[in-house]
Amino acid sequence: MKNYLAADTASKYLTVVLSYNGKRYVCYEEDCAMRHSAELMPVADRLLKEAGASLSEMDFFACVVGAGSFTGIRIGIATAKGFSLATGKPVLPLTSFRLAAYNGEGKKILALCDALHGKYYACAFDETGLETLPPSYIGQEEILRFVNDGYILRSTERLENLPDRFSCERVTPSEALAESCEKLSEDPSNFGEPIALYIRKSQAETEREQKAAAK
């Protein structure tokens, strides 16, 4: 098994997984909103010390590139790129959708992330894991269509605003992160430059464009 250090900073929670000599070391914080930049490095350092490992011993680094919090995504990417630059080891970019759909072979899955205001980031996969809906910004009506077509709803988040008529499985974030790293790292083509997956413009960008258009 490869040694790796992976982080998911794309949501309110923080997940860091270190795999070293076949053993996993995990830190999971349910509510880390707005503190990822302060928490990530100390957590990574603590796990490395606990395992008696060093960054140079990692075979690769992984980060979640979206969808999710714009700020959180940037923090995770910058950290992984920094580790990669310091060690010369590759980066494995992951998406929140792949994490939500991990171990879902044989099922049709609609992976969801909360986009606020009653909207969701979504990506659908068929029984073989192929995308049937690329990363999109959708509402409850679109979700219902997928449910009626036999799709299972999954998320790494607790979707508190999702209506009760929808049943959404929440996968364990740390397990999804670790299992996705171990499966996807088997294919060298999955490694590369981590590029943020922004499905829609940030609120700040939208406001700037609106102000510019009003001039």
Pin down the residues of each PLM region.
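Oxyanion-binding and handling regions
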Residues: 1-23, 35-38, 92-215
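Short amphipathic
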Residues: 25-29
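Short, well-ordered amphipathic alpha-helical segments that serve as non-catalytic structural scaffolds
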Residues: 36-51, 97
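Generic structural marker for isolated residues within well-ordered, non-membrane alpha-helices
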Residues: 44, 80, 159
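Phosphate/pyrophosphate-binding loops at sites that engage ATP/ADP/AMP, CoA/4′-phosphopantetheine
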Residues: 44-60, 146-151
